[in-house]
UniProtKB/Swiss-Prot annotation:
Span list, region Interaction with histones: 80-188
Function: Scaffold subunit of some HBO1 complexes, which have a histone H4 acetyltransferase activity. Plays a key role in HBO1 complex by directing KAT7/HBO1 specificity towards histone H4 acetylation (H4K5ac, H4K8ac and H4K12ac), regulating DNA replication initiation, regulating DNA replication initiation. May also promote acetylation of nucleosomal histone H4 by KAT5. Promotes apoptosis. May act as a renal tumor suppressor. Negatively regulates canonical Wnt signaling; at least in part, cooperates with NPHP4 in this function.
Chief place of localization: nucleus
Name of the gene: JADE1
The protein's name: Protein Jade-1
């Protein structure tokens, strides 16, 4: 049973090779309708049939011989089911038709310029013209207004004479041909004997050895561009070419300067780098310079071996300090001159071949090279070798001979110039009309008209050519390119120098900043050391006035402030003097009390009256608010003064009070804690408000069980260790050992100004403490029984509601607290002043 279905795809087909239905009528009708919709007026020429492929497919279970079927192993076998392209109506296939098209004479195609390739020395491709050929075909002469006016008049005459008119392009071509032939023939005439060419000059010499003679195998060769004359061996020419020959500089198209002399041009060879050039004669006559290959006479080497003394010589002939000069070979003669300058002035320059095949070069200054004879020179040399003084009788005819020689040279030069000027005046004789007419295929009459006009126009222009010769144009172009490259080289050189200067400046600035940083670090270390020493002296005892003054001066006035808002040094010194005066006054009051035995002065009332005057005066003078963070520091200073007073009275200090470092007090009394039988654990310190903690401490200090104990009572010292409080009992009189405070430099930014309520509470607490303890004795060195000690401890614990304060005061500590209350305002204000001045001074 056949069933119609759409053409199968890769997803519809199964791997088991299921049967495919033929192309049904339904699909055929659909395809035809779609074809008709696409092609309304014409029938389709081809269709895709799938029934042909479907009819060829068989099921796998179909029984056939192996030679009657093919197995489709292609993974893309689904593409077979797309159908076969079958033509339907062969009549609609177009038939080829040919027709003859008439040839159009107009130019149909113009080759764009971008397809014109300049291949250089390579031959152009087929169908293309070399760009140089196109450039040569362009006329180099352009008509001006005068030429156009003359051409108009000439065409009118040609009409009257019945001759064809002359166009502008033909006139330009003829004038260009005249100029080219005139230039070529004139140069040829100058190079020949009739025109005084250099090849036929009898006085010409080699540019290297200055010899006019040539030999077989060592001929004299002339450059066809710069006309220098050199021997083959002198310039390193291995084989003379048959045609023209160019020297190295002309072959490369450069005009360099000699590295050893100021002369331009001549027989030059490059150095090993190829960027610098040296005359061969300069390389031969300067002793330090050598030549790499004697056969090729190049490259010039060992230029760097020339000493600085030779570079510093000034030429006596040209008076220029440029390059390297040589000196006269006569003994005791130091006259210096360039090699090329000596050749130009005709000085005596000898080349002597020694017995050991060594070549010696002898050069003489103008004084010693005036027509010397060989016998005289040999005799003088022998006399100089024998030590005889040099005596050279001067010829009276020498000046006249030199004048005659100069006159002959000037006459020869003038004759040459006259002949060259005559050749330039007779420029028209170097052009042949018949040759020009044949070359351009023009009538002789037309060429003759143009020839007469060309002569007149060139005469008006002072016999100068109307167009620049092509060779000179190329040379000028090469020179311009060389100048551009030289300017770019100078620009890059200056840029390199500027960058080097910037690098040096950057290095120096970096070095300066490093030095400044190291100096600042050293000053900071010195400042910290001075601060530490000052604090240690003030904590340990009474510092000497000299050491205290010197430390303060070094600490506060080490370096003057340079800021616009910084205080003046005079003001800081005045504050420092006032600070020392106040500290000395309070310290004298505290030290004089124990030395006096008067009971009236030792009474609590008198002490309170005497000491209460100072803080009031200081407080009114300063008028500053005392922050809470200074209380611990002031307590430490008050205790230090108390310790110093006890030392004056002979009171024995405990051993554990002498500390050399800033370790916590718990580390120092750890050994004592092990020996104590009474141990009690306390709660850790809670992070409560600072004001609450201060109130608790004040309440503990002013309690009756602690503050009003009899003299001789013994109290427990509770040191602070790692956030917990520990009470330690001592068998002897306990004195509070002040801990070394931290350096104020580290806590400069940690000051907190207390609020208004806290200030009032602190003021009230301090006033109450001061009035309550005003009747206490100064020292309590007796002992308290154990019962009273237990009572006071129990009462203190009950009043604190289970909270243990940071420090519980002993009798000596209570007295220190009195002094702290008395000196609080004055000492804290002075402490604030010194820290503020330290900040400003730094």
């Amino acid at each position: 049973m056949k069933r119609g279905r759409l053409p199968s795809s890769s997803e519809d087909s199964d791997d088991n090779g299921s049967l495919s239905t033929t192309w049904s009528q339904n699909s055929r009708s659909q395809h035809r309708r779609s074809s008709c919709s696409r092609h309304e007026d014409r029938k389709p020429s081809e269709v895709f049939r799938t029934d042909l492929i479907t009819a060829m497919k068989l099921h796998d279970s179909y029984q056939l011989n192996p030679d009657e079927y093919y197995v489709l192993a292609d993974p893309w076998r689904q593409e077979w089911e797309k159908g076969v392209q079958v033509p339907v109506s062969p009549g609609t296939i177009p038939q080829p038709v040919a027709r003859v098209v008439s040839e159009e004479k107009s130019l149909m195609f113009i080759r764009p310029k971008k397809y014109i390739v300049s291949s250089g020395s390579e031959p152009p491709e087929l169908g293309y013209v070399d760009i140089r050929t196109l450039a040569d075909s362009v006329c180099r002469y352009d008509l001006n207004d005068m030429d156009a006016a003359w051409l108009e008049l000439t065409n009118e005459e040609f009409k009257e004479m019945g001759m064809p008119e002359l166009d502008e392009y033909t006139m330009e071509r003829v004038l260009e041909e005249f100029e080219q032939r005139c230039y070529d023939n004139m140069n040829h005439a100058i190079e020949t004997e009739e025109g005084l060419g250099i090849e036929y000059d009898e006085d010409v010499v080699c540019d290297v050895c200055q010899s006019p003679d040539g030999e077989d195998g060592n001929e004299m060769v002339f450059c066809d561009k710069c006309n220098i004359c050199v021997h083959q061996a002198c310039y390193g020419i291995l084989k003379v070419p048959e045609g023209s020959w160019l020297c190295r500089t002309c072959a490369l198209g450069v005009q360099p300067k000699c590295l050893l002399c100021p002369k331009k041009g001549g027989a030059m060879k490059p150095t090993r780098s190829g960027t610098k050039w040296v005359h061969v004669s300069c390389a031969l006559w300067i002793p330090e310079v050598s030549i790499g290959s004697p056969e090729k006479m190049e490259p010039i080497t060992k230029v760097s071996h020339i000493p600085s003394s030779r570079w510093a010589l000034v030429c006596s002939l040209c008076n220029e300090k440029f390059g390297a000069s040589i000196q006269c070979s006569v003994k005791n003669c130091r006259t210096a001159f360039h090699v090329t300058c000596a050749f130009d002035r005709g000085l005596e320059m000898k080349t002597i071949l020694a017995e050991n095949d060594e070549v010696k070069f002898k050069s003489y200054c103008p004084k010693h090279s005036s027509h010397r004879k060989p016998e005289e020179s040999l005799g003088k040399g022998a006399a100089q070798e024998n030590g005889a003084p040099e005596c050279s009788p001067r010829n009276p005819l020498e000046p006249f001979a030199s004048l005659e020689q100069n006159r002959e040279e000037a006459h020869r030069v003038s004759v040459r110039k006259q002949k060259l000027q005559q050749l330039e005046d007779e420029f028209y004789t170097f052009v042949n009309l018949l040759d020009v007419a044949r070359a351009l295929r023009l009538p002789e009459e037309v060429v003759d008209f143009l020839y007469q006009y060309w002569k007149l126009k060139r005469k008006v222009n002072f016999n100068k050519p109307l167009i620049t010769p092509k060779k000179d144009e190329e040379d000028n172009l090469a020179k311009r390119e060389q100048d551009v490259l030289f300017r770019r080289l100078q620009l890059f050189t200056h840029l390199r120098q500027d960058l080097e200067r910037v690098r040096n400046l950057t290095y120096m600035v970096t070095r300066r900043e490093k030095i400044k940083r190291s100096v600042c670090k050293v000053q900071e270390q010195i400042f910290n050391l001075y601060t530490k020493l000052l604090e240690q002296e003030r904590v340990s005892g009474v510092p000497s006035s000299c050491s205290s003054s010197s430390l303060e001066n070094m600490l506060l006035f080490n370096s003057p402030s340079v800021g616009p808002d910084a205080p003046k040094i005079e003001d800081l010194k005045w504050h420092s003097a006032f600070f020392r005066k106040q500290m000395g006054t309070s310290l004298v009051h505290s030290l004089k009390k124990p030395h006096k035995r008067d009971p009236l002065q030792n009474s609590p009332g008198s002490e309170g009256k005497t000491l209460l005057k100072q803080p009031d005066l200081c407080g009114r003078r300063e008028g500053m608010v005392v922050p809470e963070s200074f209380l611990g520091l002031e307590k430490t200073f008050a205790e230090a003064r108390l310790i110093s007073a006890q030392q004056k009275n002979g009171v024995v200090m405990p051993d554990h009070g002498k500390r050399r470092d800033n370790r916590f007090h718990c580390d120092l009394i750890k050994g004592d804690l092990k020996d104590k039988s009474f141990k009690q654990s306390h709660k850790p310190l809670r992070s409560t408000d600072v004001s609450q903690r201060h109130l608790d401490n004040t309440r503990a200090a002013t309690s009756p069980g602690v503050g009003q104990s009899a003299p001789g009572t013994r109290k427990e010292i509770v040191p602070k260790c790692n956030g917990s409080l520990i009470k330690v009992n001592y068998n002897q009189t306990a004195v509070k050992v002040p801990t070394t405070p931290a350096s104020p430099v580290k806590n400069w930014g940690g000051f907190r100004i207390p609020k208004k309520g806290e200030r009032q509470q602190q003021g009230e607490a301090h006033d109450g403490a001061c009035h309550q303890h005003s009747d206490y004795p100064y020292l309590g060195l007796g002992r308290v029984p154990a019962k009273e000690r237990a009572k006071s401890k129990l009462k203190s614990d009950n009043e604190n509601d289970g909270y243990v304060p940071d420090v519980e005061m002993s009798d000596s500590e209570s007295e220190a607290s009195e002094k702290k209350c008395i000196h609080t305002s004055s000492t804290i204000s002075r402490r604030t002043d010194i820290i503020r001045r330290s900040i400003l001074a730094s």
